[in-house]
């Protein structure tokens, strides 16, 4: 046995064991190498550590602030800069470890300290262009505690949870490094640039007050739950007529299955949905069809996996963390169980401003919806509106016509609207009532449809938070709609017309166009949990099921279904606004009857468009038609007579000039990807496999040994992970039962 330290032999021995003690009393690197030989074979093991030098003090290179900077003139070089400090003092030392130095803590990779500040930086050279390197910072805090963190500005991160994701979701994903701890950053110089089409480069965003927004959760819209699968539905979105798609949060979040309101890295796309290139493909295809893309951002809070939260974690250490508000001191109670960003801190504001600008520049998104915007604050909430204006100015600096939509319920909403932003307007209760055939609303109440008839406020019949209107119609609707699907779904175009043909920006949650009738508070076994009001169904499930898997809708879109008939009519109604007469709807309606408690409601856009609907569950209604020449848009006929009789649940749309009714598909045949059997490919190298089936929470619910096929027939419907070994590697596949 031979032991070397920094290349010099320090001890030799004969046998199978050696003991050696060395006092690490001098600053520097210590590289140990132990060699064992029996005369014919030799084995070597190495270990390295260091006693840190005091960090070199040096100004950051010009233009380097915080994050990852690639040198366009040198594709073998990257500059890293990170903030590492408490409210009162910087860290003692910061090192970078990664694939480029075998994850070794070394003085050679200690970051320089910028001007006695809490910013530390380093230039890495000699990297292979386009090669991916995993890396982390090792921070020695001022109190001596050592933390490993990713880069706050990471565009791709890895986590040990990635092994649970099907490989097809993110092809060729770099394996998680054995030496990693928590989230690790991936850097890559000379990354190929995405080629945007002219449709994106020259995209003209729809007028903000003429938006018809389709809120979409990537996980639930297709069985495959990916950006790539959404690409297969572009005709569907185009036929529906919406001119904006709002994606629920897609930034990296904890775990692999979430709404996304638990973010940890704001510059990285969550890998469960696919690659950044696939997201760009989706955005580009939307632009080719005149559809803007809005993304939902969560700047109120983060999880404890954010690198700045890891550095001084939630709990006792949080009081030292300049990035977050202290628990118990924040003026609002929203999300107080997660680290709450301190927006008084300059680097916090800089990060989020850069985040907005990054998504506009890198992904060509068209705007943002800001979750829980009324909760954004510093140590007080006195300046919330000014803070929103600060961020809006950052957006406008990059793109003057980008959308800024706020989930802002406070009285300050009018101030923000006057500053050019849009605010959410929750009108879902009104549309639940009209869907059920209960129309005795009172002006000014939540069931008042006129609240959805104004510029600058995004009104909606459903959002991800609200109950499904046609679930309520199925449960508590008037007359036959609780038992007759055709009657119930036949009311969908009526409800949608009196949303999408009103004034101002409008929104609905995906599948509202089909009259989706599963409760938001119902899981995949059709059991209900508590709703937002704490009401639990008679089935007694004691949990919130809003994020649980819901039933699939692909069979509804086949030719001849009542849902497909509703979709066809809804698409024609929306296209009237977004494609055929957008200039009309960019103005203001001249008259509307929305709040008088009568079954008959009307909307009039001068001599251009007249809409009438009968919201009753029984009994016809007669409407007086405004004077002039009118054409029945949905029937492609000229209107004769001065009155129209409407059946229960019927809507009529008249136009002042004859326009072509858009041709709609008879149906769609989308992939279902639902399999009861997972076939495991046989190989000549291995015998039959041992298979384990897990729930998404990690619970083992099935074990099968020596099998070539895993039979899932006996399991409840839902999403599972099937794990087995192949060629010495553990393989995990996500399967929908």
Where do the model's predicted regions map?
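Short beta-strand segments within Ig-like beta-sandwich modules, predominantly Fibronectin type-III
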Residues: 10-16, 110-115, 702-706
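Basic K/R-rich, polyanion-interacting modules in nucleoproteins and related proteins
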Residues: 50-94, 149-209
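Aromatic-rich carbohydrate-binding modules that target alpha-glucans
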Residues: 80-130, 140-165
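Substrate-binding/active-site clefts of carbohydrate-active enzymes
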Residues: 156-158, 193, 197-364, 373-383, ...
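Active-site-proximal helices and loops of the catalytic beta/alpha 8
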Residues: 251, 259-261, 291, 355, ...
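C-terminal beta-strand-rich structural cap/linker in extracellular carbohydrate-active enzymes
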Residues: 641-662
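C-terminal outer-membrane/trafficking sorting elements
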Residues: 660-737
